[in-house]
Amino acid sequence: MKKTHLVIGGAAAIGIGAALLADLTGSQTQGLANAHKAAGYEPSCETLQEAGETWALCSIGRGAPAVWLQRAEAWATGNGVAQGVAQRLEARGPGPYQSLPRLYVDREKPVIMPAGVLAKL
């Protein structure tokens, strides 16, 4: 096999791996973004790994973003903006979006944002 074939094959493998990683990273917040859309917002969500936990910040076109903490397959509200999104979603229903993640306010184990998340606000 020629060196050019090996280089092209290697570049293709790296490209496929990067695309899969981007897809997996995006799918982590896709359900959360759809929940915001069902609540009537046009979000822009990003995830952060802080203190061994997965956090999501979803900008909805107002001051501070909605902050969420992933706990198992659900997302706990991290601030009042996120609580407002959850309440609005509960009132409006899922609309055309199916399989939305469970959103909740954790009253037993309150969400405390680490410094890295606070710095993004």
Spans of model-derived segments:
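Short, non-transmembrane alpha-helical segments in secretory-pathway proteins
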Residues: 20-46
